């Protein structure tokens, strides 16, 4: 039996979802009456289709009359046999059309041979009623489908929540069904003005959502029948464009193919490869429309599902349970779509400053002595290192919250030494808890058993699987008692070993046996009538039984939330244990994950293909509100090469989360392992990242408080330029920096797209003033682009980074840790537009405290340049950041040599001007938290 918690549980923001629906004939919300031929089968046809007593699953309530209107174009067909292959006779028994079609070139799946006719019976819209927040209606079905346990009467609630957000649910009014326990906004009145209009088809039921601005149809569910059976829900819609992204996690291009593509969402432990379900599930997509417009759609459903894309273009959601809970975001531009999505699922957490430094790990640092030596080697080679990690090696028998007294006997002292050196420490923590020891020998299991925190099997006993420590039980993080138990375990272990963050792995959850060591029951949860395209051919492949019981529901419903709920528990536990900003990196994710944790992209291979694929992966997770994301630099599986590792380090310097990690028995790949030439190239990339950390930290602040992205695709900034829509091997940091990495072997040039505007090579900024880099070789210092592809020089020691005209970025002298770099002098790079304008921002606090915004313990500055004058605007100043010392202002785009430079009305005599690069370098001695004015003439 499912155990339902009271509505007051902290995660149950949707426990009592707001219920409203759209009705026609009011304002712009017109109820369309569809033509007679589209209304479905007549009662006579229904009677002829299925005589009383018919029991065949192909006939159960389904019309047998030969369908008409089967002359649909192949790309506009919607599959009438999603569950299995069927014969022409079985297809017609379902009331569908059968017509063979060729497999399209380069398609992942074929066009359906058995497909719905336009007249296929669906639901009918009835009892339309106006409510305070929108409208409500009843949906009734007269003819059952070919799936068991159809729900014949449904309730439609539609909420016009905001100007740009429309929300509707379809659910069973008679029986409570599982709903995702994600806290979402509540509204109590209808938005007075909207960017959308809504129309309805009465029979067959359908919803059409249009953008008022141009009348474009964004959502049209009339293209295929609605299914709502107990274990099969299908909602299809047309798409206004083939340019669609989202629906993570998958390995591939940022833009999805609409050429018959199926994306499966069921979190799975598997090394990333194309066309398989990976570690996370994010049922959200964003569509780019003509004219720079965009919209997004979010299906708040955590059950196993397929999402099918077809060339018409159209999309079909196929879920195995829950309800249909749909949000539509009107933008109107892509940036706003992302922010509106994050308004629903939550803005990202603010990471500690040190978390943006370099992290180093590998599976195989088998002793504390080896771990110490790695840190020492990094220091001797003059490579920055902020956070040292350990994999399973530190554990006693690979059990959580223990350490090996033989190989890590001085583990607590080692961590203290890292702290004394200005560094931090993170270790792996898997969710599975060893269950095989004698009672009283392993406190996490003993306490968990006593407190009832584990997922249970059909007998009510803890489900036992097998993971790294052997036999294991799995904590149920939807149980409030489990959150408290996890907090206790984390706090107790932290009292022994003062770690600084948690790396939560294997949390799909991963299991080395199918389901459990005792197998799984033979029931409809284990063998659903519709099985999405999961790797392994069963829901229990590499995980636990779908029918196992959790506090909120069955694992069948909650599987995709496991990583999210563990991230929340770990986030909360770290706050309790440390009293400072938590740092959690998780492998498994779901919508809203960025509120609690970052993500790394899993067990990637050390090859050029996976290096290249990491760029769209980083971009996609930023669109999904998980900006703290990165891939294992140099690759995890297999052996890297020197050139690959150099290029990966250069790109990795621009991952929001920068970590080098590799597998047991792989060749070592720490930066100091390579030739001096390679080391110097890597050192330049490290230096560049550390110099730019103030800008990166400011971007994370903006993501945290405004729902912005950190790393972002070009189309987010330039949506009106269609050439940017498919660019996914370059990335932007915020609005200002364009990174064009080398992603292929043996290349000394790289071609990138430069949107319209002026772009300054960042190497023309005199960072040698920091004493860290030699002056750059002569380069093409500025690109005046009309929107074009540009081939750039990219020798092995170079990653191309360009600063966009109109922007100002803060920089700081580098060091081997952020503890030291935060003490260095600041600099500002000012990139002028043709009209001589630019602006930028700096956010600064102590880098790790909680509640700095509420307490006012931060400094926020706005920088403005106009009319040959540069000023700082003091938005908020506190002791944190007020005393930062500014030593250099570099102005790019100064066309003529200045005769005079003034700083606070005092002449600056030692400024320099380079006519070749149009660069004005102004040495200053200023305090950032005090008003200043710099001018040149």
Curated annotation (Swiss-Prot):
Signal peptide feature range: 1-23
Residue positions with a glycan: 127, 220, 259, 377, 457, 639, 867, 888, 910
Annotated substrate binding sites: 391, 587, 603, 661
Keyword S-adenosyl-L-methionine tagged: no
Gene3D superfamilies per UniProt: Glycosidases (3.20.20.80), glycosyl hydrolase (family 31) (2.60.40.1760), Golgi alpha-mannosidase II (2.60.40.1180), Spasmolytic Protein, domain 1 (4.10.110.10)
GO biological process, one term: lysosome organization
EC numbers for this chain: 3.2.1.20
Active site: 505 (nucleophile), 508
Catalytic reactions on record: Hydrolysis of terminal, non-reducing (1->4)-linked alpha-D-glucose residues with release of alpha-D-glucose
GO molecular function, one term: carbohydrate binding
Family, as annotated: Belongs to the glycosyl hydrolase 31 family.
PANTHER family from the UniProt entry: ALPHA-GLUCOSIDASE, LYSOSOMAL ALPHA-GLUCOSIDASE
Function: Essential for the degradation of glycogen in lysosomes. Has highest activity on alpha-1,4-linked glycosidic linkages, but can also hydrolyze alpha-1,6-linked glucans.
Identification of the protein by name: Lysosomal alpha-glucosidase
Species whose genome carries this gene: Bos taurus (Bovine)
Classification of source organism: Eukaryota, Metazoa, Chordata, Craniata, Vertebrata
